Regions:
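Basic/polar N-terminal segments that are highly enriched at the extreme N-terminus
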Residues: 1-3, 449-457
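Intrinsic-disorder/low-complexity, polar/charged segments
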Residues: 19-22, 73, 428
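A general structural signal for short secondary-structure junctions and capping/turn motifs
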Residues: 52-55, 93-95, 279-280, 380-384
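Short loop/turn segments at strand-loop or loop-helix junctions that form parts
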Residues: 63-68, 105-108, 349-352, 394-396
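N-terminal basic/disordered segments at the start of proteins
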Residues: 1-61
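Non-transmembrane, aqueous-exposed alpha-helical and coiled segments at domain scale
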Residues: 297-309, 315-347, 353-402, 454-456
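Active-site-facing alpha/beta catalytic cores
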Residues: 70, 77-323, 365, 373-374, ...
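Glycine-rich, charged/polar anion/phosphate-binding loops
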Residues: 47-49, 273-276, 303, 332-334
Length: 457
C-alpha cells in the first residue's frame, strides 16, 4: 500500500467534491486554516476510542445524534443548549434502562457539508449548483449564493470553535448535573401523551436518585454526577478542510483530524480506492462507516481491512442505514461476515436515512418507521448473538414539525407549521426523548438486567 500523508487523498478519484471556480482563493483559505489552532485534541480522541472499545465489547451503548446539517443562520446559544439538554435526557434514560454507560457523541461543531444525489438543481428552467451545506454554498436559489465560496470554510471553523466552547462549558460546568437532567425528564413525562408508558421507568430513576441522596451521593460530593464526557463528530466530506486541520500529535507522532473527535464516511463516498477512504485510513481518530443496502459482505471486509488493519477495538463504528423494511435482508449477512472474520467493530443503527418519504410536498420520516428500523436492528443482533451497540439519529432540541408521528401524532398536513430544516427532516425534542424511552425498552429486554442499576448520565 502506498505511503499515507494528509494530502495523499489528492492523487485518488473523488466523489461529492464541489466545483470551486476560484482555485487560488481555495488554496489560500486552506493554507490559512492550516495555521489555525486545532478544534479538538488527540488525547480526547484517544479517550473516545477507549470508550467505544467498551461499546464494541458489549459493555456500553453509543448515542450519536444532532443536526442533519448545521447552519450559519441558526447558530446561537439557545439552540446549542436546547440540543444538549435533550441529548442528556436521552442519555440518562438509556443508561438506566441498559445498566450500562452511554457514550455521547453529537453531530455538531462541524456537521456542515452534505452529499447530494445531483451536482445541480433545476428550477423553472434555471440550472444552478446544488446546495451542499453552509460550509460550501448557500440555500438561496441564485448564482451568487450557490457558487461555492472558500471563505465559508473559515466561517464554519469559527462557528465550530464557538459551539465547542459552549458544549465544553455545559458538559463540565454544572449544566449536565444529573439532578437537573432528572427534573427535565420528569417534565417531559408529565407533558407527554404517552407519559403513562414512561412513568414506571421515570419513577425508578427517581427512587434511585432519592436513595443516592440519602446515602450522601450527590452532585456536590461526586463530580461524575455534575459532569459528563461529550464528543463531537461529523461526516468527513470536504477533504481540503479536513486536511488543513490534520495535525501531528506531539506525544505519539500520530496524525489526527482535529476538526472533530470522530468522523465518518458516508454511503456515497466509501469506494475503497477513492479519496475519502484514503484520507481516513491514515488518521488515528475513531471512524464511522455508513453501511447501506448496496454494500456487500466482501466489500465491507475490504473497507475494514483498510480502515482498521490492526483490528483495534473502538477504532471503527459500522453505522447501518437500510430502511425499516430492509434490515432483515441486509444486516444479518454483514454481521455474519464480520463475526466470522473476528473483526472488532461497534454496530450502530441509523434509522433516519433509509426511511425518507415525501408527504404533502415535504420530505419527511415517519416516526413509526424510524422505530421499526431500530427494533429490527435489535432483533437481528439478538438472533446473531452480537451487541446492538448504538443509535445514530438526526434530531434537534427545538419544537419543529419535520418527522410525522410520535406521541403527539404529527400529521403530513402539520409539517408546514414549523418545517425549518436546511436539509433532511429531524426528530424534534419530544420525538427524540420518546425514541430514547422506546429504545430503553429494547435495551432492558436485551440486557435482562432489570434490577441492576447504573447511573452515569
Amino acid at each position: 500500500m502506498t505511503k499515507w500523508s494528509p494530502n495523499s487523498w489528492r492523487a485518488k478519484p473523488i466523489q461529492q467534491v464541489p466545483a470551486y471556480p476560484d482555485q487560488a482563493a481555495l488554496a489560500e483559505t486552506e493554507a490559512r486554516l492550516a495555521t489555525f489552532p486545532p478544534l479538538v485534541f488527540a488525547g480526547e480522541a484517544r479517550k473516545l476510542k477507549k470508550q467505544l472499545a467498551s461499546v464494541a465489547a458489549g459493555d456500553a451503548f453509543l448515542l450519536q445524534g444532532g443536526d442533519c446539517a448545521e447552519s450559519f443562520a441558526e447558530h446561537g446559544a439557545d439552540n446549542i443548549r436546547d440540543f444538549f439538554r435533550v441529548f442528556l435526557q436521552m442519555s440518562v434514560v438509556l443508561t438506566f434502562a441498559g445498566s450500562q454507560p452511554v457514550v455521547k457523541i453529537g453531530r455538531i461543531a462541524g456537521q456542515f457539508a452534505k452529499p447530494r444525489s445531483s451536482d445541480n438543481e433545476v428550477k423553472d428552467g434555471v440550472t444552478l449548483p446544488s446546495y451542499r451545506g453552509d460550509i460550501i454554498n448557500g440555500t438561496a436559489f441564485d448564482t451568487a449564493s450557490r457558487t461555492p465560496d472558500p471563505a465559508r470554510q473559515e466561517m464554519a471553523y469559527r462557528q465550530s470553535a464557538a459551539t465547542l466552547n459552549l458544549l465544553r462549558a455545559f458538559a463540565q460546568g454544572g449544566y449536565a448535573n444529573l439532578e437537573n437532567v432528572h427534573q427535565w425528564m420528569l417534565g417531559f413525562v408529565a407533558d407527554s401523551p404517552q407519559g403513562e408508558r414512561y412513568e414506571a421507568l421515570a419513577n425508578r430513576i427517581t427512587e434511585t436518585m432519592d436513595f443516592m441522596s440519602a446515602v450522601g451521593i450527590t452532585s456536590e460530593t461526586n463530580y461524575a454526577l455534575r459532569e459528563t464526557d461529550f464528543y463531537t463528530s461529523h461526516e468527513a466530506l470536504l477533504l481540503g478542510y479536513e486536511e488543513a486541520l490534520t495535525r501531528v500529535d506531539s506525544t505519539s507522532g500520530d496524525w489526527y483530524a482535529t476538526s472533530g473527535h470522530m468522523i465518518w464516511i458516508g454511503d456515497r463516498t466509501r469506494q475503497p480506492d477513492h479519496a475519502h477512504i484514503e484520507y481516513c485510513r491514515g488518521i488515528k481518530n475513531p471512524l464511522g462507516l455508513k453501511c447501506g443496502p448496496s454494500l456487500t459482505a466482501d466489500g465491507l471486509l475490504e473497507l475494514i481491512d483498510l480502515l482498521n488493519p490492526e483490528n483495534e477495538p473502538g477504532r471503527l463504528t459500522l453505522i447501518a442505514r437500510f430502511g425499516a423494511d430492509k434490515v432483515g435482508e441486509h444486516l444479518p449477512r454483514l454481521i455474519r461476515a464480520v463475526k466470522k472474520e473476528g473483526r472488532n467493530v461497534v454496530w450502530s443503527c441509523d434509522p433516519m436515512h433509509g426511511n425518507t418519504i415525501t408527504a404533502a410536498g415535504y420530505k419527511t420520516r415517519p416516526f413509526d418507521r424510524i422505530l421499526r428500523e431500530v427494533q429490527s436492528f435489535f432483533e437481528v443482533h439478538r438472533a446473531e448473538g452480537t451487541h446492538p451497540g448504538g443509535i445514530h439519529i438526526e434530531m434537534t432540541g427545538n419544537n419543529v414539525t419535520e418527522c410525522t408521528g410520535g406521541a403527539r401524532a404529527i400529521t403530513a398536513e402539520e409539517l408546514q407549521d414549523r418545517y425549518h430544516t436546511h436539509c433532511d427532516p429531524r426528530l424534534n425534542a419530544d420525538q427524540a426523548i420518546e425514541l430514547a424511552f422506546l429504545v430503553s425498552e429494547l435495551l432492558k429486554k436485551n440486557s435482562g438486567a432489570s434490577e441492576k442499576k447504573v447511573v452515569n448520565g
